[in-house]
Amino acid sequence: MAVLALLFCLVTFPSCILSQVQLKESGPGLVAPSQSLSITCTVSGFSLTGYGVNWVRQPPGKGLEWLGMIWGDGSTDYNSALKSRLSISKDNSKSQVFLKMNSLQTDDTARYYCA
């Protein structure tokens, strides 16, 4: 019976469960080629010490491309094709994750997301 009650809650009120976690990106709208891009992701609803955060991007008319991630312990993994130009860091006390990308090229034109 408890399982049915839980299932009813999940089906009827999914927003009350999923709306707790939020990630919001902030940064410049446009950056010129050869310049650097810096984006901040502010999270709420979970602790950065216990969970990792990924960065992805989506060029116009294309699919998502994984850039890299930072784990709860602060270690990082990067897309090998972009590793030399990327840096991901975080400030646990401010619940913020930072993406920095250097030497931008026209191929870097995309929407950038944290997830």
Curated annotation (Swiss-Prot):
A Pfam family this chain is assigned to: V-set
SMART domains, sorted: IGv
Organism per entry: Mus musculus (Mouse)
Organism domain of life: Eukaryota
Signal sequence region: 1-19
GO cellular component labels: extracellular region; immunoglobulin complex
PANTHER family found in the cross-reference section: IMMUNOGLOBULIN HEAVY CHAIN (PTHR23266)
UniProt entry tagged with the keyword Signal: yes
Name of the protein this chain belongs to: Ig heavy chain V region PJ14
Single biological process term from Gene Ontology: immunoglobulin mediated immune response
GO molecular function terms attached to this record: antigen binding
Keyword entries, A-Z: Adaptive immunity, Immunity, Immunoglobulin, Signal
Annotated Ig-like domain residues: 20-115
Record keyword Coiled coil present: no
